């Protein structure tokens, strides 16, 4: 382990030395650029564009282009990027991750690689975690880009397709991650080229890259249509599971956060629903609803995993504490929670298109990211996204004091200590930021502070509209701010007058998060740009993380230490080590889970790319689709002939071929079995193809205008492809749920899914070709058919 660590540190040092040399080259242009007039500096952009067109690479232009952007920033924004920011910019241009501490000016760092990559004209997407940050950064940094002659666009969910298209045409576009994903899916569901908004995925620079590519990696983006779900079963299963007793009828595995019926629970279910065997195949729908009702009632927690607002269940992002507007838990879990909370059950939706962020961002030609905390996940970034994580030195040394964790036996004693610490710090006017992991914790702590008459603001999933404003003021003298997780990321906490002298911002964590990275983000809010500050975590044996991992070992340790007092506090390296190893286990589990999702999703990715590529060819075709249709007709006929000419000649089913021809290709009584006798299978295929070609020519005559014929071809193909593809997504989704149950009998669920998924896809292609052939041959021509 020590050797691996040594190698990492060495390779980081080597990489920083290399980047530093390039940054020195950028610095060497500083004097030359400062002597140019505004017009001369602005003219550099067109000069770079010309050089790029003539074959000069962006890498070669980097020192000069960065220097232009840097000088432009000084003149337009009054900000001049430091040497370490130039280094960060180089990392970003090279398609890697720049880990830069909070307050080190990531937004300004990004301007240099964004400007350089905009020169190619292929488009740069700057991705932020919310629309507020998109708008803020596009407005502030857009002044610089516009001054340098680059167009800037903002993409958001309120825009019309025309406005979106304009935004994507810009040299530089600001957008949230979800909007890019939904635009991609909508583009691949469009039936007219004019309805598409994107123009290829060239270079993405992702702000808060860990939040988007790690924390949200498992979140699929889904476009749904109405399904056929029923709310009755959700209510029945909810009523049933509410009667069950813990550890008698059901058991919970805290480590994996799963819940299942015991034998006793299964018997009760069979009696309640009047069944012989709960796990008979015909009861699949019921068992699925039962599983979701159990999860909803005994795993999913109100005010932690979700909130209820205005009679609606809204998901809470477990990493940021923000409400995720418009998102719903999939696979019926959302409906099960609605049944649990007694609100209206919204009908289940059928998935029409979906993609995960992992596969969306891997489609970019070049991907880069920046964050204050990525090093703990560097292996995942390397393995899944092929990005290296480079820690950029701070401009000034970090002055923050990170104090060791304090552990208390109970939640009550822990919160009493937290309130006591807040009182002491508040008395001298030191601003305090308190981090909590759940909405209910922040509200509980708020009540305790009210009792002590300590003025404070609460920032959680329920009021994130004001979050940027609240976070901005958190560094003022006497401010006390309670924040669920790290809501308000992306907004700097600047210290108010006189705060530096009394110790800077104090950060108090009320619980360790299951990810070390989130803890580091909380600490990192203090001590920006060499400011003083302090951070400390308060823990208890009743915390979630402690209960899930290592609680028993720590309890035994406390007993050995003879710690019985309710209010006793322990500081110990052993405890800190236990907490960190618990976090590493959770991180490992989460990584495995994300990797697992990716392996399954890769099966769909390959299939999605094939379908979307074919669709795009059809939508963009401007002459004729005969080259697509004729091979389709032939393959369909070939399959049918092969199927009916198996074995000896005497066993051939020629009547079956005639029946197929009459159903799909021709009018009844056009051919008989006699017409096929004496022909080889290949001759039969050629014979039937003559009829298909005849019908095609007939349709051309009827439509007389090639543009109308092309439109007819597109209508037929797209209707069939889209209908079969959405059904296929649904079937694959259901199969993926059930394949996990096949992990017995030495069968690997992933291999099962890959194999069956391949066969299902092959079958879907055959069905598409059959249906397209039938629809084309048998449809009557009507004018003004819409796709």
From Swiss-Prot:
HAMAP family xrefs: SecA
Keyword Translocase on entry: yes
EC number: 7.4.2.8
Role this protein plays: Part of the Sec protein translocase complex. Interacts with the SecYEG preprotein conducting channel. Has a central role in coupling the hydrolysis of ATP to the transfer of proteins into and across the cell membrane, serving as an ATP-driven molecular motor driving the stepwise translocation of polypeptide chains across the membrane.
Family to which the UniProt record says this protein belongs: Belongs to the SecA family.
Name this polypeptide is given: Protein translocase subunit SecA
Entries under InterPro entries matching the protein: Helicase_ATP-bd, Helicase_C-like, P-loop_NTPase, SecA, SecA_CS, SecA_DEAD, SecA_motor_DEAD, SecA_preprotein_X-link_dom
One term under GO cellular component: cytosol
Complex and partners: Monomer and homodimer. Part of the essential Sec protein translocation apparatus which comprises SecA, SecYEG and auxiliary proteins SecDF. Other proteins may also be involved.
A GO molecular-function annotation: ATP binding
Ligand binding (ATP): 85, 103-107, 492
Key words of the record: ATP-binding, Cell membrane, Cytoplasm, Membrane, Nucleotide-binding, Protein transport, Translocase, Translocation, Transport
Protein's cellular compartments: Cell membrane; Cytoplasm
NCBIfam families reported in the protein's UniProt record: PRK09200.1, PRK12904.1, secA
Keyword Transmembrane: no
